[in-house]
Every structure is written in structure tokens, then in C-alpha cells.
Design a protein with these regions (language model features):
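C-terminal non-catalytic regions of proteins with extracellular/luminal or membrane-system context
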Residues: 1-207
């Protein structure tokens, strides 16, 4: 028993709309809204790579179907953290991308106001979004695989002494933040790594 809080629950299967529904919808609108959801998870077991950080196979099929039917696509990310977004640049139909996060019970109402133009997100990007997961400096130290507890990195792997509470649960995931001052955009700028979306970005075409 190495887990005391939470248990990872995979995302439910994605709904696959029938072809006739897509055909009918594309006859009366040229715009599609796709909401990509992720569960918030539990403590120490929030994320996985397959079907979580990356799109699932079902989601990939749905994305291709949407882009094949609608020339304008808006994507809303509804989850507790970032995911791989390399597919956004690969589909020219995607013209808007909004990170909604986990906004709570009033989230849908706020989203509706943004979508119809009643409100403006009015914020600059507060994080750097990498092109590849390996571009994040903390990735190699991110210990997440609780399905294989013996592969989890512990305090001892970093030469650290665990706090008393963690000495009972030897295989609790530990991530060592060793970036020093090179956090976020400082790391990408200092080491010449081109991000997918830079931190603090407003727009590239403003006067």
C-alpha cells in the first residue's frame, strides 16, 4: 500500500458523433466548438501520459472528423493542467484556443459569455507551453507512474531525507525542482528552446 490519497480514474470514452450528424451540422454552420476535458484526479495521481497528457485515439479520430467538416474550430481545454497541444498547430481549422481550467459551478456561464463576446478573457498567458513534454526541465524528475510503484522516484533517489510522514509511504511520488532561477520562460529563453506558446504573450500582430 503506497497510496493514501486518491486513485487515478481514467477519462471516460469520448462520444463519437455519427457521420450524418456531422453532415447535418456542417450544413447550417461553418464553426465547431470542441471541449477537451480531463478529470482533476486525486492527490499524487493526477496525470498519465497516454489518454491524458496526450489525446486518446478516440479524441484524435473526433478531431479529424471535426476539422474535415468545419473550416472554423474553437477548442476549449477543461482540465486541471496543461496537455500536449502540438496538434493545434497541425490543424489550420483551429482558430481559437481557450484554457478554461477547472472553473467550478459558474464556469459554464462564464464560458458562454466569452464565446458570444460578452466578456473578454483579458489575460496574458501566465505559463509557457512547450512543443514537447521533454522541453519542460522538470519532466525527467516528474515521478507519476503509480501503476508501477517501484519505478517511482523517492526522496532517497535525490539524496534527500524524507519528512517523517513520508517515511511510512516509501513509494510516494517525489518531484525535485532543480531549475534554480530558470523557472518557466527563463529556462526557455536562457537555453534557446522555442516554446509552442510563450509566457506573457499578448499577440504577435499588435502595433
Amino acid at each position: 500500500m503506497y497510496e493514501i490519497f486518491g486513485k487515478y480514474i481514467p477519462n471516460p470514452p469520448e462520444f463519437s458523433p455519427p457521420q450524418e450528424l456531422l453532415d447535418e451540422a456542417s450544413r447550417w454552420t461553418d464553426t465547431a466548438l470542441w471541449i477537451v476535458g480531463r478529470k482533476s484526479g486525486g492527490e499524487e495521481c493526477d496525470r498519465r501520459l497516454e489518454n491524458d497528457y496526450y489525446l486518446s485515439n478516440q479524441e484524435k479520430v473526433l478531431l479529424e472528423a471535426i476539422c474535415a467538416h468545419f473550416p472554423k474550430v474553437a477548442v476549449v481545454l477543461n482540465g486541471n493542467g496543461l496537455m500536449d497541444l502540438s496538434w493545434v498547430e497541425e490543424h489550420s481549422q483551429i482558430q481559437a484556443l481557450l484554457f478554461l481550467g477547472v472553473p467550478g459551478e459558474e464556469g459554464p456561464a462564464a464560458l458562454a459569455e466569452l464565446l458570444v463576446g460578452k466578456a473578454n478573457p483579458s489575460g496574458k498567458l501566465s505559463v509557457t507551453i512547450a512543443k514537447r513534454r521533454n522541453d519542460y526541465p522538470a519532466w525527467e524528475d516528474f515521478s507519476w507512474d503509480k501503476d508501477h510503484p517501484k519505478q517511482i522516484k523517492t526522496y532517497e533517489d535525490y539524496g534527500l531525507i524524507p519528512p517523517l510522514v513520508d517515511r511510512v509511504f516509501a513509494h510516494r511520488p517525489v518531484t525535485a525542482y532543480r531549475e534554480d532561477i530558470y523557472l518557466g520562460y527563463r529556462y526557455f529563453d536562457s537555453f534557446g528552446i522555442e516554446p509552442l506558446y510563450p509566457c506573457l504573450l499578448y499577440t504577435s500582430d499588435a502595433a
